[in-house]
Amino acid sequence: MALALQKNQSLQAARATIDKAGALSQYAGRLDNPELKLGYSSDHAFNDEGEKSYTIGFEQRFPVTNRLKLLRNVSAIEVKLAEAELRNQERLLIRDVESATELISSLNQRRSHLDGMVRLQEDFAVFLKNRIEKGEASTLHLNQVQVSLFSVKQEIQNLTKKRNRALGSLRSLLGLEPGIEVEILAEQAQLTSLPEMMALDGEDLRSHPEYQLKASLAEIARSQSALAKANRWADIAVEVFFEEERSVDDPSGLGRDRFFGVGVSIPLPLHDQNRGEIEASRYRERQIGYELNAVTLRLKNEAETLQRNAEATYRQAAKYKENAVSLVEQNLKDIKNAYASGLVDLGEVFRVQEQHLNIQTAQLELWHELNQILIEWRAATASDLPNLSNKDLSNETE
């Protein structure tokens, strides 16, 4: 699992989003750059008496509200939002990797059972051919076995293609190149008891990545509502300037005057009070609140449904093992003893062995279904997921 968390390209992109949000947050909420103002005028085009003036000034805009603080707050929450998105993607990635691994493990065991079925039916076909030569069996029975054998071999080919697709998906999740082989070494383990499955509530819910993601969006919406109200007042402008003027004064002629001044520009919210943005932000805040409630209900219901399905499937698998599996194993033991005593022929032994393999396959499907439900439950509750130590992955470059 560590390989997937390290190499998966989607997670790399999510981590880059955090870096981007952090960089934006570092410089958010700063004053606008000051403006340098230069001016020059003369009477050259009119009286041409040599009169002129020069002006240089600096203007800086300052907010009259807490707009900059709100901008810094929104930017900081956006970092939390990016981190929650990363954790949520990690949760889903772990689910997908475990699901793919579980599927491949199940397909491997299913293939092993089918290989056993092929060997059994091939031996049975040889047995029937010998009996046909002795006139003790019909070719109809042999044809039925050969048709069944062909069907099993076709199923093996379908399983192989399905396994190849699952391996390709797993390779992508692990961030591996196409030339790297991935092999599932451990077999599917049957549970002896269900893990403790607590309801998703309280702190567990609040720490869920998807809940935190939506909660961060709600927090941003609240801050943006406050920001919209703060934007009713535009920034005031403060100007500091120096002016020099040369003008004609009778009767002394050209004279020079210098001025130093301060100017203030105060915008008045008489026409545009940002009411549209204020109303929109209020509705957006309400919308995110509804979405947060919807996420809360969905997460709780999904966790509860998966918990009930896990309990029902576990009881079904345990009952199936107790009844059908135990019964067919006893039948197999009895038929072998009967064959050793000469009470039945080898054909009956083959048929019971085939039934035994079919029952084992059905039992395998139940355990696979249960394991998949548990994987979904751990992802739905964002529980601490086990690593793949029980399903070792070995990979090597061809």
Residue ranges and their predicted role:
Residues N73-A76, T139-S148, L346-E354:
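Short, charged, amphipathic alpha-helical segments
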Residues M1-Y40, F62, L70, E136-S138, ...:
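Bacterial Sec-pathway N-terminal export signals of envelope proteins
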Residues A84-S207, L306-N309, T313, H356:
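Periplasmic alpha-helical coiled-coil/stalk elements that build and connect Gram-negative outer-membrane
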Residues S53, S99, Q144, D235, ...:
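Transmembrane beta-barrel architecture of outer-membrane proteins
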Residues I56-Q60, L170, V262-I266:
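Residues on the lipid-exposed face of transmembrane beta-strands in outer-membrane beta-barrel proteins
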Residues D48, S53-Y54, N143, Q157, ...:
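Outer-membrane beta-barrel domain signature
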